Amino acid sequence: MSKLPGINHLVAVRALEKAGFRIIRQGKHIVMSNEERLVTIPRHNPIKAFTMGGIVKDAGLSVEQFKAFL
């Protein structure tokens, strides 16, 4: 499994939208859902690689699948 770079939170939101997630609510964090899973994305830049890896795992995607949506 390859590593994820630290990325901008807006890029992460766009990638998850391509994966079928929709924004549920926004505040200091953005909460997204695909009707099965709930994912929370912090609003700071860049999102560290370790945190981004957890978000991708929570979304039920592999790193390679997520990178394809970037």
Regions found by a protein language model. Give the residues of each.
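Basic nucleic-acid-binding interfaces
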Residues: 1-70
